[in-house]
């Protein structure tokens, strides 16, 4: 029986490109090579495409993918050269130009099935402000927030924020993930500095009420029918779970499943599934919650392409449900093919 090709797209132009490389290297080792043949393509920080390694058997732990530090100009290709009939693309790309609908639109033009959610849902979920407004309309609880758009009056925004929120306050670029560009403000001066930092990454800024809370995450999997995992908890050794703590210092651990009251667990899974449906997601997502000290539950973020290394929360949540890392990848490929056929059938 001939093997099906999985195309791994990794790298990208966003500040989250290093996370993408880690995810791709994990996936290429976990794939079932009895069924699949793997081709990898790197998108450089400049936005160019490079044809990198191919694998017909499981690569060794020492095998590393091309990065911006090891570019080989002779491997540069046209973006459309990734096309292969009947191949499925796994876009292991995070942040802008990766999970914001850009690459999804490109793959739909190429008529290639791809893992993950569609153009519109990717765009909505990538923008934290738009996500909040959609989830508000679905009745899903969230922390209070204000918004600053570059070009608007900053002083008016600060006045509104001080009237609406209390310190500590978190300031976030609307279109970044992995905690890139996010900072915590505990004073008016700190708020100004946090907004200035966030503006380096985006022109749309989300300003949120800080809460003392446990950080709980739920995995989602499916297309028109969605399944959710039992929650897992992020346990921090730092005050703020930022990019450095997540990916460099390893100052976090995870409790899977989280120790949570059964009623709250059910409520959390319900809200996660409703959020997935509200944005029209498909394939996979990870829903992140705050469980406050007073027992209130707030949906913090919906991530349509969560970190996908073997030690990332999303695969571990599914492993706890009895779905192994390798089988999860296979299920995502199947869901990608299902959605591709559905999209094609709608083009009447």
Curated annotation (Swiss-Prot):
Question: Which annotated residues bind Mg(2+) 1?
Answer: 288, 301
Q: In which pathway does it act?
A: Cell wall biogenesis; peptidoglycan biosynthesis
Which is a GO BP term held by this UniProt record? peptidoglycan biosynthetic process
Q: Which residues bind ATP?
A: 162-217
Positions that bind Mg(2+) 2: 301, 303
For activity, the cofactor(s) needed are: Mg(2+); Mn(2+)
- Where is the ATP-grasp domain positioned along the sequence? 132-334
Catalytic activity annotation: 2 D-alanine + ATP = D-alanyl-D-alanine + ADP + phosphate + H(+)
Question: What family name appears in the similarity comment?
Answer: Belongs to the D-alanine--D-alanine ligase family.
Cross-referenced HAMAP family: Dala_Dala_lig
- Sum up the protein's function in the record's words: Cell wall formation.
Protein name, entry field: D-alanine--D-alanine ligase
What organism does the record attribute this protein to? Streptococcus uberis (strain ATCC BAA-854 / 0140J)
């Amino acid at each position: 029986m001939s093997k099906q090709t999985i195309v791994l797209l990794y790298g990208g132009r966003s500040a989250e490109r290093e996370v993408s490389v880690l995810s791709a290297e994990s996936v290429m080792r976990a794939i079932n090579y009895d069924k699949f043949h793997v081709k990898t393509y790197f998108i450089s920080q400049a936005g160019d495409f490079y044809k990198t390694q191919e694998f017909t058997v499981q690569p060794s732990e020492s095998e590393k993918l091309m990065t911006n530090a090891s570019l080989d100009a002779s491997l540069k290709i046209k973006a459309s050269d990734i096309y292969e009939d009947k191949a499925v693309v796994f876009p292991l790309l995070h942040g802008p130009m990766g999970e914001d609908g850009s690459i999804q639109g490109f793959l739909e033009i190429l008529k290639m099935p791809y893992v993950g959610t569609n153009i519109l849902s990717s765009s909505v979920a990538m923008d934290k402000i738009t996500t909040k407004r959609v989830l508000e309309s679905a009745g899903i609880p969230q922390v209070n927030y204000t918004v600053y758009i570059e070009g608007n009056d900053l002083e008016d925004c600060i006045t509104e924020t001080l009237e609406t929120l209390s310190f500590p306050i978190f300031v976030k670029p609307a279109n970044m993930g992995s905690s890139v560009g996010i900072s915590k403000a505990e004073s008016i001066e700190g708020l100004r500095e946090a907004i200035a930092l966030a503006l380096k990454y985006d022109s749309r800024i989300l300003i949120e009420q800080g809460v003392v809370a446990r950080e709980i995450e739920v995995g989602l999997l499916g297309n028109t029918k969605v399944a959710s995992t039992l929650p897992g908890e992020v346990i921090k050794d730092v005050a703020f779970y930022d990019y450095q703590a997540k990916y460099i210092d390893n100052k976090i651990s995870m409790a899977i499943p989280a120790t949570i009251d059964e009623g709250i667990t059910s409520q959390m899974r319900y809200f996660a599934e409703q959020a997935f449906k509200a944005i029209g997601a498909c394939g996979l997502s990870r829903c992140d919650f705050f469980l406050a000290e007073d027992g209130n539950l707030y949906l913090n973020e919906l991530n349509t392409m969560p970190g996908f290394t073997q030690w990332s929360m999303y695969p571990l949540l599914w492993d706890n449900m009895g779905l192994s890392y390798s089988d999860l990848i296979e299920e995502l490929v199947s869901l990608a093919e299902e959605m591709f056929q559905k999209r094609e059938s709608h083009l009447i």
